């Protein structure tokens, strides 16, 4: 009888999904985010010692709350693995504290895990706001995964690895995309750019770039974002977003080159 109960519990976990949300002072959008994921089996909020009402909101919604010490971290990635490990169920959906999950996406994920050939990871398209406009073209995030064998590196903009194949949801089905609510002003984008590129330098220790790279890599990133990733269809906002994306690459490479030059300073 005990063995039967253990097997039943194991099967139940295989058919359930835990939502994991990493937070730090995330009160602005958190209620809407939690409303959008209320149809899942478990919601885990992994908080990095917020000083606003984030924890109050999470507890009010009945979330499982765990704490990851913030220390000097300025990015979320160091807390990702801990958050995933805190989930009860075998399948985990990682949601940022400014992203909405549609009913259609939830249904798609439950349908997926009911099939024997379900991929170990699913890349989900994400539609982003910028300058008050919701972009139709998405970026992809590997956010739905099987917990067993998953590893999320602690470096900025890292992607998890999973134990098995992955697949992408079709971008043309807009109803399956995350809705990214963050509509950062250009000033805030530039402020974040400085923080994020500092972390990019740490991630790329030992990487070497040439002056050619400094020119061509940011240029290609801008052109790709504008012409091949749909920016051209979004007017001035599309051009501004593409240039900011290229600037991110330029500042990253410039800081890495600066770091190398300073190592050679013999003063």
Residue ranges and their predicted role:
Residues 28-31, 52-61, 104-105:
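Acidic helix N-cap motif at the loop->helix transition within catalytic regions
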Residues 36, 47-56, 96:
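A conserved acidic beta->alpha catalytic loop
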Residues 55-86:
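Conserved donor nucleotide-binding strand/loop of the catalytic core
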Residues 20-39:
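Short, well-formed alpha-helical segments that are part of the catalytic scaffolds
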Residues 16-18:
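Cell-envelope/extracellular polymer assembly enzymes that use nucleotide-activated donors
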Residues 77-78, 84, 95, 102-263:
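Catalytic-site signature of metal-activated, phosphate-bearing donor transferases
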Residues 92:
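Short aromatic/hydrophobic "clamp" motif used to bind/position activated sugar donors
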Residues 21-24, 49, 70-74, 116:
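Catalytic phosphate/metal-binding cores of nucleic-acid and nucleotide-processing enzymes, i.e., regions
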């Amino acid at each position: 009888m005990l063995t039967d109960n253990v097997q039943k519990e194991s099967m139940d976990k295989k058919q359930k999904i835990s939502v994991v949300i990493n937070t730090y002072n995330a009160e602005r959008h958190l209620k809407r985010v939690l409303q959008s994921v209320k149809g899942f089996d478990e919601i885990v909020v992994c908080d990095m010692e917020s000083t606003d009402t984030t924890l109050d909101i999470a507890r009010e919604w009945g979330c499982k709350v765990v704490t990851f010490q913030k220390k000097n971290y300025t990015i979320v990635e160091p807390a990702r693995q801990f958050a995933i490990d805190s989930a009860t169920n075998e399948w985990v959906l990682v949601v940022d504290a400014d992203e909405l999950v549609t009913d259609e996406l939830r249904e798609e994920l439950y349908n997926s895990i009911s099939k024997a050939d379900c991929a170990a990871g699913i890349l989900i398209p994400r539609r982003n706001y910028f300058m008050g406009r919701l972009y139709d073209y998405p970026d992809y995030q590997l956010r739905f995964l099987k917990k067993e064998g998953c590893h999320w590196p602690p470096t900025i903009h890292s992607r998890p690895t999973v134990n098995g194949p992955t697949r992408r949801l079709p971008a043309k089905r807009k109803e399956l995309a995350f809705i990214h609510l963050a509509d950062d002003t250009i000033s805030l984008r530039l402020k974040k750019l400085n923080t994020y590129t500092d972390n990019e330098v740490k991630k790329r220790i030992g990487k070497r770039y040439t002056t050619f790279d400094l020119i061509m890599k940011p240029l290609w990133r801008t052109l790709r974002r504008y012409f091949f990733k749909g920016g051209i269809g979004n007017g001035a906002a599309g051009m501004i977003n593409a240039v900011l994306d290229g600037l991110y690459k330029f500042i990253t490479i410039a800081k890495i080159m600066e770091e190398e030059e300073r190592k050679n300073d013999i003063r």
